[in-house]
Amino acid sequence: MARVRDGIAELLGAAPEEIIYTSGASESNNLALKGIVQASRHVGKHIISTALEHSSVGGALSALQQQGCEVDLVDIRRDGTIDLEHLRELLRKDTVLVAICAVDSELGTVQPIQEIADILRDYPNCRLHVDATQAVGKTKLVLSGVDTMSIAPHKFYGLLVKKKDLVIEPQIHGGGSTTPYRSGTPALGMAMSIEKALRLALENQNERIAHVAALNRLLRAELAKYPKVRFNSPENAVPHILNLSVNGVKGTAFQQELGKNDVCVSVKSACSVEGTPSKAVYAVSRDRKNALSSWRISLSHLTTEAEIAEFLQIFDRCYRELAQ
């Protein structure tokens, strides 16, 4: 177990004692947010986050609000990144936590984590939590200035990377055999799987990202020929995620029609409430109808040009049937 933890830490550029095993990203997010805030209750109860976060972050923040915490959401710019000036305006002496996702799961937006960390240097009592679940293998992980980072590879098990000098309140109590912050004996097989999954995700990363980026550009160029198509993902998003809307057609309709042709696309994030618009798309576009029409294409380094060509043929048939 020690060798595996050393291997994971080396891959992430962290110290072995900074690695905490959890059941998944939801637990990692809850442990980080609740653990930080509860350990900082003597400093303050003010938290800053965004409307783009995973439901495990939103749920944890709601629970903390019920315990008397105050939560402010930083504005989102049109390109999907947070408004850094608004973040500066929201920060207070009693702000104890800023919680930001590294990569948005619906749009693929890459948040400026290093710039956020630099801003927080002037607030030594404020901790930065980063949900990096969507970032591993898609972009460079930034650990400098980050106090806690959630990872789920993907999604059979979880990790929380916690800065070694940071004290948080545990949420699961017991013997604390491997760490005082999370009781419960980790499963060796799952821990070994994390190391292997991380190694596979990070090997040849630059070449793989370049391959996916080329496919993304091809998709954008071809889909842009359809007058009712609107891209929601910014140009500088991770290329693995392409979110779009077809004006006047609900995303669920396209999802069902494409599904009949064995094409799988996503409508919102997996943990969203059914029947509601994508909160990420709405946060960027401020357009409820557009958000309801949105859906996401996912690409990987295993996707081929032939598969893109086949998808475009199927999309063309679906577009003619649903949008005209």
Regions found by a protein language model. Give the residues of each.
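Pyridoxal 5′-phosphate
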Residues: 1-324
